Amino acid sequence: MEQQQQKSAVHVSKLFVCTAVDCKDEIEEKFERSYASLQQQIAGLSDKEMHDMLTQFVCKEKQHEEISIGFLYIILTDPAMAPKTYRDITLVSRDGMNVIVANLTLLVAEKYTKLTETARRQLIWVLREFVKHQVLSVENVIWNCLRQAGGGDVSHKNLFLVESLLDIFIEYRAWLETNPFLVQSSVYSFVRLIEDHANPALISLRQKEVKFTISLIRDRFHDIIPLGRDFVRLLQNVARIPEFEQLWRDILYNPKSLHPTFNGIWHLLQIRTSRRFLQCRLLPEMERKLHFLASSVKFGNQKRYQDWFQDKYFATPESHSLRSDLIRFIINVIHPTNDMLCSDIIPRWAIIGWLISSCTNPIASANAKLSLFYDWLFFDPAKDNIMNIEPGILVMYHSIRNHPFVSSTLLDFLCRITKNFYIKNEDKIRLGVYNSLKLILDKQVIPNLHPLFESPKLDRELRNLIRENFREFVSPVSNMPQTMYPATHSIQAPIFKKEADQRITQIENIDVGAGVLAANSSTISLVDDDSKVATIPTESLERETEAVFSDEDGENLGRCTKNEENTDDDDDLPLSKVRLKEKPVPEKVELPEAIAESFEIFVTKRNSFTWEAFLKDFRTLPASTLDETQLNYVISNTVLILRETLPQQNVFSESKTEEKCLAKSISYPLYGLFRFLYENEDKSKKPFQSLLSEICERLSETGYLLLYFMKIHCKLQTRKNAQQSYQFKTTVYRQICEATDGKIASCLVRDLDLLEKENTTIYLWLLPDIYREFKTIAINNTDLLRITLRCVDAKNVRDIMYSIAQGKMTIFKQDGLIECIRESLEYETYEQFCLWQLIQAHDVPLKCIQDILPELEAANHPEALSHLLLLLKNEEPTNEIIRLLLSREAKSRGDPFVTSALRFWCQRCEEKLSEIIASLLTSKYPSSSPNKRKRPSKGSSAASSTPSADHVLNHLEHYRRSCRHGTGTGLYVHDMMQRALQSAYTHSNESTKKQFSDLFALAAEDETTAVGRRGGSGRGRKQPAGKKDSNNHSAGSKKNSDVVKAIYSSDESSSEEDWSKHKITQAAKKRKKAINDSD
């Protein structure tokens, strides 16, 4: 019994807080063991004796790591000994403290919550020392410390960490600014933390945070821009603070003052925030629990886990703000596999539904809903992931039966936020929501929207609000079956401020200058043109009860009372009549005589002929003739008629050859405008320009319908007059772009994007004409290329390749193609395979794209590497290609891409390949003759990607290992390669000799190089011991960096086995003997 007590007393840790039931894990045991070992070795020694002894010990990798961790343990547990220990560590460390930084990173990421108070204070002390002396990779430790500074936590322990990190950043600001990623992470974190520090007791800390953050944002705004839309979401919550209010003014009204390339708030909102920044706002422990909940807990068994999570992380009033961080993380980071989606694991929407429905704070609840729908507001199918919008629709769809209050509240919020989030760009917000819903239906995330949008459990007011906001997705109840899937969708008719129905109750306008409202104002919105904020009262948002998602059935929750039928209900009206009923009818205005008659006829007859007659009168009308009221009257009626006369379905011709169908498809009044512009290209008066501008702004389909019109018009005119060839008049399209103050390149991409979403067949039909008529814009245009690749199938790719082969279409030119390939590395696998098919169809020579070889990674870019390998097989090895290949980073297990290329070249031209590599290796050493060095040509990129000697040796070593049973070993036995290896051995340090001892052993003994090894035995005799040391060294070097890589990066992996060197050594000796005999 006494022995057990003594044993337990011995194991009391000074570094970790442990309870009686805690078991030590590998990390804790490692630190304790290293400390005990160090104490045994240095006990009773003087400083000099300790340094001498430790200097001998650290030569071996294992002892070096053990001693380093032991010293780190002393620093963290003994404040009095910390300065002396830090000095000792700098004397004995032989890797720039890499081992210490790697283990400290692991300690902070995995065990920070278990550190004693002394250890946490000493952690800050050692971090300050590391930053002061600019120790490499210390930013990894600081980033993990930032993660431990949790949101929604105002405990003394958390505030100490926050303030300590802030002091380090302020004191060493110059060092901080050298690391853009750390600048971004610190700004994102502190803007989030400032929100939690509103308590008057924390005013001094909050003021210090505000001053530092604002200063860093303004000084380093070019680094802040990539933070994207979630950074704007965080800025909204602190917008009432005077310094942030001024920042908002500059963002909204004077963006160029922040950075010359910054174009305003919409610039930020279009950028998706990186997962790393969303991740940094969750504690590592919390992240692990969340991953467990979303990947291991079965649906129906989650209640006890949710209760535990609630008690652990949502116990204080301040912790409610954490829900938004969790929802953003779940939506953007946790993307389950198909197998998980088909399993009985709890889905993401259920976790999010629980987080929202269990929130009792109205401000936090509104912010949580915004987090759920935030990606909807800016959704672009070309760039954004459907997984980011899927939870929003599913939580509403699956809650409507058992939790109708959750669904109704979320639908109400979505309707109101669409209109009021950013009034100035309401049209773009609506387009984002429209794109989201359309893609949800196209991908059949849910069968259709009818059970949700027209559920009898929704109250009448909400159903009207849904119909008003999502009229494109609402159909007459009487004509729609219960589970009908919407087969077609009409072109979106954007809603504009002038036409918007102001039915939102209790809307108030608060003058806050430029200040976007803060979260504590109980509203969510962005500022409009008049510095007013249209606000949504949270009272109208908070209509749900506490409907907790659990394994219990929610049938007993409150139900919506059944609405009584009203004779005024327009549910039974056709949708077209509902739209007419809702549209405001402009009051009639007297117009000038020059246009009054023709305009009246056009309004009455609504056809292309009367429309073109009116345009002829209106085009020459001077600005002085019309006042603003008259002009608005003309514009409103015109846009209304043009929109209503366009067919809701089948806007394009069903046949591409039949003249009757083609002519009918461009017979509507909007095409009359295009025909008029086609025939009248000279400059028009200001009223006509205003009319044209408004039509383009309000009818988003104008641009692509004009492209369609030009294709049909030219086709029909050419058939009428076969002797004359009619071409696109790009000047007409340019006129449309100028009317909207847009650049033709961006307008073209936008219009083609909309066209592809509306009708892929017509888009592909127009594509050759686009590349021919807009070739300066279209060729090598990555945006247009991405639109094409996302919609093509195998037959479409075949047809495009036919057009390229026949010379009818050119997608790429050699100059700039490499930039297209670089950007395509982020595309989906199928899209990249299609891209390489198109590149091959252009017969692009390898030399135009070979510079990208060093940039490609085996783990991340398999598509590009696969196709480049096939291209390399058709090439002969050259100095330039080999230089680029050997510039590639050689991972711990080699580069299979380089090995494969060398292997198939060895089969065809082994001697030439050996000479090129030998020449490149020889040129890396000072004793080599300058005349023998292969100098790059003027057009090459030698300066940027020249391999070092270690790079070349690494690739040769991994190639050696791949040559099992001696196959392919002839590369090493040629004269130049033998001399190159001997020269490399002569000029290498001991570490390199040990690392590549097996490779150097392939160079046969040469008496002429014996001077390079004076006094030493031959390499063949030294090899066995050297091989063992080399393996130990390589393993130790890899271990030092594996800890940080596991947290901060991901490594590539490939499988290449080592091989027996016996046969290759024999081959080398035979080759050398033959040379000597011939001499």
From Swiss-Prot:
Complex and partners: Belongs to the multiprotein complex Integrator, at least composed of IntS1, IntS2, IntS3, IntS4, omd/IntS5, IntS6, defl/IntS7, IntS8, IntS9, IntS10, IntS11, IntS12, asun/IntS13, IntS14 and IntS15. The core complex associates with protein phosphatase 2A subunits mts/PP2A and Pp2A-29B, to form the Integrator-PP2A (INTAC) complex.
- Source domain of life is Eukaryota
Which compartments does it reside in? Nucleus; Cytoplasm
For whether the record's keyword set contains RNA-binding, the answer is no
Q: Which family does it belong to?
A: Belongs to the Integrator subunit 3 family.
Main subcellular location of this protein, as a coarse class: nucleus
**Any coiled-coil ranges, and where?**
none
Biased composition regions of type Low complexity, renumbered to the chain: 938-949
GO CC annotations, alphabetized: cytoplasm; nucleus
User: What InterPro entries does the entry give?
Assistant: HEAT_Ints3_C (IPR056518), INTS3 (IPR045334), INTS3_N (IPR019333)
- The chain residues annotated with the modification Phosphoserine are S1049, S1050, S1054, S1055
Identify the gene encoding this protein: IntS3
This chain belongs to the protein called Integrator complex subunit 3 homolog
Which of UniProt's keywords are assigned here? Answer: Cytoplasm, Nucleus, Phosphoprotein
Q: What does this protein do?
A: Component of the integrator complex, a multiprotein complex that terminates RNA polymerase II (Pol II) transcription in the promoter-proximal region of genes. The integrator complex provides a quality checkpoint during transcription elongation by driving premature transcription termination of transcripts that are unfavorably configured for transcriptional elongation: the complex terminates transcription by (1) catalyzing dephosphorylation of the C-terminal domain (CTD) of Pol II subunit Polr2A/Rbp1 and Spt5, and (2) degrading the exiting nascent RNA transcript via endonuclease activity.
Q: Quote the PANTHER family the UniProt record gives.
A: INTEGRATOR COMPLEX SUBUNIT 3
Q: Where is the composition biased (Basic residues)?
A: 1062-1073
Chain segments carrying region Disordered:
544-574, 925-949, 1010-1079
Q: Which organism is it from?
A: Drosophila mojavensis
Q: Does the keyword Flavoprotein apply?
A: no
